[in-house]
Amino acid sequence: MDESSLLRRRGLQKELSLPRRGRGCRSGNRKSLVVGTPSPTLSRPLSPLSVPTAGSSPLDSPRNFSAASALNFPFARRADGRRWSLASLPSSGYGTNTPSSTLSSSSSSRERLHQLPFQPTPDELHFLSKHFRSSENVLDEEGGRSPRLRPRSRSLSPGRATGTFDNEIVMMNHVYRERFPKATAQMEGRLQEFLTAYAPGARLALADGVLGFIHHQIVELARDCLAKSGENLVTSRYFLEMQEKLERLLQDAHERSDSEEVSFIVQLVRKLLIIISRPARLLECLEFDPEEFYHLLEAAEGHAREGQGIKTDLPQYIIGQLGLAKDPLEEMVPLSHLEEEQPPAPESPESRALVGQSRRKPCESDFETIKLISNGAYGAVYLVRHRDTRQRFAIKKINKQNLILRNQIQQVFVERDILTFAENPFVVSMFCSFETRRHLCMVMEYVEGGDCATLLKNMGPLPVDMARLYFAETVLALEYLHNYGIVHRDLKPDNLLITSLGHIKLTDFGLSKIGLMSMATNLYEGHIEKDAREFIDKQVCGTPEYIAPEVIFRQGYGKPVDWWAMGVVLYEFLVGCVPFFGDTPEELFGQVVSDEIMWPEGDEALPADAQDLITRLLRQSPLDRLGTGGTHEVKQHPFFLALDWAGLLRHKAEFVPQLEAEDDTSYFDTRSERYRHLGSEDDETNDEESSTEIPQFSSCSHRFSKVYSSSEFLAVQPTPTFAERSFSEDREEGWERSEVDYGRRLSADIRLRSWTSSGSSCQSSSSQPERGPSPSLLNTISLDTMPKFAFSSEDEGVGPGPAGPKRPVFILGEPDPPPAATPVMPKPSSLSADTAALSHARLRSNSIGARHSTPRPLDAGRGRRLGGPRDPAPEKSRASSSGGSGGGSGGRVPKSASVSALSLIITADDGSGGPLMSPLSPRSLSSNPSSRDSSPSRDPSPVCGSLRPPIVIHSSGKKYGFSLRAIRVYMGDSDVYTVHHVVWSVEDGSPAQEAGLRAGDLITHINGESVLGLVHMDVVELLLKSGNKISLRTTALENTSIKVGPARKNVAKGRMARRSKRSRRRETQDRRKSLFKKISKQTSVLHTSRSFSSGLHHSLSSSESLPGSPTHSLSPSPTTPCRSPAPDVPADTTASPPSASPSSSSPASPAAAGHTRPSSLHGLAAKLGPPRPKTGRRKSTSSIPPSPLACPPISAPPPRSPSPLPGHPPAPARSPRLRRGQSADKLGTGERLDGEAGRRTRGPEAELVVMRRLHLSERRDSFKKQEAVQEVSFDEPQEEATGLPTSVPQIAVEGEEAVPVALGPTGRD
């Protein structure tokens, strides 16, 4: 090699080597790789070259450099010479115009390519090839290793490094802003104009809820991009994820909405993509990493050569694989042509009619109101039924004037958008919305089981497993919402609804905020603090006990406020009361921001993992709070160690609501005493104050469109689906048809509930077609027209009876009576052994799981008058908590095998007909399988078999001549039982014997009202009201599925399945009359000295004589009855029956008084004082309840009563957790008048916790939403004030010994 070549080579080595420590960066003249004139612009800045490491590999990149020197930019000085142009490179950044292809992708824009010679010699090419490809270091002329640290490009693209450092992002943005200042300023200016023009508050809201939510997200993405650009945090990876989010939102808009407003969303997405397109391309070029590219290129080359056998034209193949050979116009033209010029597909008249009807906006006339579910500050929630599909919904009516005067129109649109967009099994779904003259209405799915607040009110603290399940399902709902940027802001037990299967659904998004959806590129340093202060409000919003400290301080808040509320909710689940309370908002907020949490001790102490979870959720600082970093922090807590998060819906819940009928709303508290909203639309309204946004509120979600169109389609299609028609429809239409015409005249204007028939097995499941069911569910829906009375025959039951036909038998009118088999009426002394042992035997059902239908008894002469007026007695008739043939609108809604026990056996010759009750009522359209069950273990109606014609007994005024007795019927092998009544004896020659009453028969109806499951006093009350004529329906025990088993060894563990005693009112009845009825019935207390010409002597118990007792009044209770399973009580306890109303003043319901909810502004209420009289207030035009924060504090709060803990008897429980989970029913039956002997000594701390749990009055709702009304709860000392006897009611034939009634766990059982 000649001397000149050697000198040139050494000089090249010097130029390529990096400076040593302490030496400044050398920057020479930059020469262009593009042939052309010198550029007058600034030279491109170089990479920061800091912290050189001796002996490093040439393949290393300066990734891990010091943070202190991160911003030291050794820019090249301005110098003469040529520059290479970025515009000459493809967007991938690997193409150059150098003569040597070996250098084409070796260096990126970050390399010192300006120091390379323009025309290298072969020796130089050999050296450069070795230099860039070899892993060996090259000795420079000074003996050092060269290079020590190669100035590679720092790529921020995914997959290159394990993490991305903020200083790298900031450094890259400095380079980007320095090099392309106009691109950055142009993007930020356009983003600001975009936000100004398209923000939700700057234009009318979209009419479609899904599109409204997507609009919110697009605007939030643009706002986040503008903020990150100002903070120098944008990267090519961020733009890539932003593009993916926009495409995902656009896909949701096309799939989930049929509105014409989709074009607006498409236009919005295109504008935003155009705004960010140029910065995204520039950053992609700047962040190009040749090392990563070479690895990918080698892998692709090996795959191409080995796998596909490509030998020639490899560069062209790579270009094709990278998509660089495609013409973008070829893909854009067909799309535009498809959108603009594609002719509409031909449609048939039927399809056009379906589309027109499905797209028709819903209105109030499409629904018929069944009853009130609950009241709130802004409006009320009603149970309604769609007139065409016959499906049940819950409709939320919000007063428009309240919203306008409070300037919260935008907030109700946010609630509508969230409910419409959300698709999660743990979030309530909305189907449509519309406006009336006075209200904004949102139609949502009906969740039957009430809310967790009512459950806590009736049950007290929940068992740990039950609380864990509820909490975990709420965590999944919260995870879904937070991923879409939704902050609920009002999490509390009141907003956690319980489905018929015992699972949780989150509802009430009236205070929610929509923020930015989760993005992976937001995981940078400082993002947690920014997200924790995403929103700032000028006033405190939420429910006081659940408001986080940062909201109280008005420091800004975000998703961590929901985790604070979750900690309060879990504490309330396990302890029974909230951890913070006070008489005034100031006192309450003072405890929230300063007080420590008080924990129960002793037997009631919480598990260590649960206490740790609550403590970490209730951290004062939102940055330290569990869940702030993501939902995975909560899900990985040891409290959920053994929990299967993926199978929560398959988990069997401990509490499964027992519904009596499809319109049963007894699990909800109507709160009629606190709020009153007029349901009429005829009241005067101020139309001048109407908002221009309100007409946009009417919308129809894709769920409702699919259901409506499917009902229209299935109504005209022949289908073998087994269906029946509701009695309310019969009552409305009022037409008559013959049996022949009824099977032929099937028209599309009749929409019926769906059934799936397989022999006599009737199953149904979730009616949402887009959600996949579990293996045990049938995802079918049919709304075809079928006869009004349909029952399945017995072909798989356990009980006796001939096997019926496999096809359903439709019975219209009164069929022939069953074959006469007149039994011999035994004398009282000659009862069978089985009947005589009923009081001490355990009766159980072994037919759990069989699917049978419930007959509805028809009176004689009503056979063909299907649509005529109904009798008063069946109007009040109800199905029992364990089943039975119910009147009214049908039998009870079935429960799982663990809850319901008795199976109804319908023989082929049964002479009565009735509607079938489906496990999934198609009138209750659920968005997912968690709302209703369709497992084969669901019993449609579990009591008796064939019912005889009613036995009418006429008395001469002396007596009826028979006695009855209450028996326990246990449900399967469980400890849950229901009370049934049998005819114990019939006197010879008495009116009862002459009418055909037989001893040993099971009484199912008295005067047309079902008595299955009623306590004994209720049955006695029905008899005493009958006068000289009584109508009984009975059935033989051998015709039922009740089996006689061995006597129970421990009757104290029995749990009675209660049912509320209430009568049904007509839909057109004025609700105001119920109050006067209730007062009139309370004054007519039954007297113990009169027999009402029945000869049945009756002793009243304390709870029956109380005016507030539900056993006294037949009117429905305004509050939710206690429906939870009863706890364990001693066997020798003589007690009055528990009150079915938690708000009753009966001392038999300590849970009602003890486990009360915190009141709105007064944390502790007086327990013994009378309720405060409500002062009259002038009716305002807007009917707006005042904000609790605006109310002045009470000068003299009511005194706190001593702890009622000594009043609780020592009840044996299997564990401390179960002891806390005792319900009001069992606590009532276990109450003693001499409860002083059963007191337990406790420390002052434990008594304080118990006092806080037992003395909190009814809970409050949101500060903005609800007014403060104090409600007084009652305590045990009233028991002594009543002065009423607590003896067990007895019924006996005149002149004979009274027979004790099995009302509870007594010694006679």
UniProtKB/Swiss-Prot annotation:
The keyword Magnesium applies. GO terms for biological process: cytoskeleton organization; intracellular signal transduction. Residues 950-1038 form the PDZ domain. Residues 88-99 have a biased composition (Polar residues). The active site is at 490 (proton acceptor). Its EC number is 2.7.11.1. Changing residue 655 to L: Found in a patient with autism spectrum disorder without history of seizures; uncertain significance. ATP binds at residues 373-381, 396. One of its GO terms (molecular function) is ATP binding. The modification Phosphoserine is found at residues 66, 85, 146, 680, 710, 728, 754, 774, 782, 792-793, 1223, 1273. One of its GO terms (cellular component) is cytoplasm. Keywords: ATP-binding, Cytoplasm, Disease variant, Epilepsy, Intellectual disability, Kinase, Magnesium, Nucleotide-binding, Phosphoprotein, Serine/threonine-protein kinase, Transferase. InterPro entries: AGC-kinase_C, Kinase-like_dom_sf, MAST, MAST_pre-PK_dom, MAST_pre-PK_dom_sf, PDZ, PDZ_6, PDZ_sf. The keyword NAD does not apply. Residues 1-62, 88-113, 136-162, 337-360, 756-895, 908-950, 1046-1245 are annotated as: Disordered. It is an enzyme of class 2 (transferase). Residues 1185-1213 have a biased composition (Pro residues). Residues 1228-1245 have a biased composition (Basic and acidic residues). It is linked to Developmental and epileptic encephalopathy 108: A form of epileptic encephalopathy, a heterogeneous group of early-onset epilepsies characterized by refractory seizures, neurodevelopmental impairment, and poor prognosis. Development is normal prior to seizure onset, after which cognitive and motor delays become apparent. DEE108 is an autosomal dominant form characterized by the onset of multiple types of seizures in the first 2 years of life. Interacts with PTEN. This is Microtubule-associated serine/threonine-protein kinase 3. It comes from Homo sapiens.
